[in-house]
Structure formats: C-alpha cells, structure tokens
Amino acid sequence: RKSAQYRNFRCGRLGTGDACRYRLRDLSDHGSFSGITKQRDKKGYKEEMTAKKKKKKSGGIFWKLLFLIALAVFCFSMYQLVTIYLGYKQGVDEYHAVAEATTVQSSEPLEVVEEKKDEEGNLIIPEEEEITVNPPEVDFDALKAINDDVVGWLELEAIPSISYPITQGEDNEYYLHRTIKQTYNFAGSIFIDSTNASDFSDCNTIIYGHNMKNGSMFGKLKQMYESGKYKDSKYLWICTPDGKYRYEIFSMQYANVNSDVYTLFSEHDDQFGVYVDKMAKQSKVNMKTKGLSKDDYVVTLSTCTSNESMRFVVQARWVGTYK
C-alpha cells in the first residue's frame, strides 16, 4: 500500500500533504534521517577541518617568516662581527709590520742632550728615577718612505704595547680612520693636532688616538689610571729625527670634549702657567710633580670613552732630550 500510494503520488494522483506524509514515513522506515544527519555531520566536520588546516597553514607561514627574518638578522650580525674583527686584525698586523721594519730596541746608554732643571739649577728628575727603559731606535728614513706625514714615534714605559708612529694631517679628520700607510681602517693613526708644530715645540701638543676594544692604539691608555700602571712608570717617550724626548706624566683625568684641556697656547706666558697648574690639580691621582711652571712643554694624550662627550686624557711635561 505504501508503495502504491507513493507511486500514486509520483503519478500525481495523491494530494501534496498525503504525499509528504508517505514520503516522511518512507524515509523514517528506511533510516534515511540518520543518513541526512550523518551527511550534515560529515559536511560540518570537513568544513571544520578545512578551517583548521587554513589556520594551521597561515600559522606555519608566520613562523617560517619569523625564522627567516631572525636568520637574516643573525647572518648580518655575524657579517658585521667578522668585518670588524678583520679590520682590527688588519690594523694590528700593519703596525706590527711597520714596527719590525723601522724600529729596534737598544740597551745602549743614552747620551744626554739637555735635561730640565728647576730655578736653582737642580735636575727635575731625581737620580732614583733615571732612565731604566730605553725608547726604540727609529729609522725615520724608512718611516718617511712609507709616509712623509710621520713626525715622531710614541712609547709609554708602563705600557710598552703603546708604541706607534705619530702622524700629522692637514686636518684632524684625515688620520682619524687612516693608518700610517694611508689605507682606510677604523683604528686610524696616532696623530697630533693639525694646528700644532710638528717638532713638538708648542706649549701644549695634543696627540689623539682611538680607544680600540682590542686594546690597540690608545685602547690601554686608561690602564694608566684605572689599573694603576702609573706606579710602574710615569714616563713616556717621543722620538723624532732630532732626538728622543722624555716626558713625565703629571695629570690623568676625564674631560669633556669642550674642556680647556684642549687649549693651545702661542707662548709660555702666565696664562699657560695657570693652565698647567690647573691640569695638575684636576688629575684623578696626585702625581706629586715638582717644578711645574709656565716654561714647561706639555703633551696631551687624548682618547675617547664609552661616553661620547667625554675623553680620557693623560698629560706629561718634557724633562729631557737624549740621543
């Protein structure tokens, strides 16, 4: 009967309501409702899984992109470090080669040309502080062949690794990042102020050098104060074609870039005498220097610090010329 009635519906002989009732019974009897539910559940599951896959895929792309960015930053940082290291090494190797080719250490006694005396005619330097460490013998002809801008050679007795040729450029920028061979290198050169006399005859000669992290150039200069190296020796040497000049350190301080430490004087007047006395009083350590006066010849060694506006400065006055 159900089949006949259903067939009659299909032939258009039953009403729409009856047809719907018979159709629903037919679906119910054959379990087709559960099939519809299952189909709907299956469709929802597929949609949910598709959404999850899309979400997972987008999340995966994000992390991959983040990884690639991190990798790029790492590679760039490594490149920077390697470049800096190679630059440091190049500078160190160059100065070592120059030192080996142009200097030798000698233990031969030095001949006195002139030594500083006080107003009473007594030597400024006491006998117990006579020369115990000779400066290097410098072949200035060989140095001048490398660079005609060379004006001297600097060496600190307490820190013998601070032993470098001194240059002078037409301005204070040229040798800031150029070596003695005039090749670009961040370490640059040890150089005197462009306005100073090249023979160190000025009242105050300023000598600049970088505070290199690898300890080269003036990278160890602060050890004179911070590590107490001045206790080993408070003397430094400047060798020139005209002679070997010995200087006694009388001041070590941190100074602002605009400080009067960098004042240049045209003559040994009272103003310069006041300046020398002031520098001695500003020293982080009382060097107990005797006989400071307006007649002194001063060299000012200056290097940068971690503070861009501050410099570490070591000042010394001439006490003798030798050969």
List the predicted regions and their residue ranges:
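Gram-positive cell-envelope targeting signals
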Residues: 1-106, 304
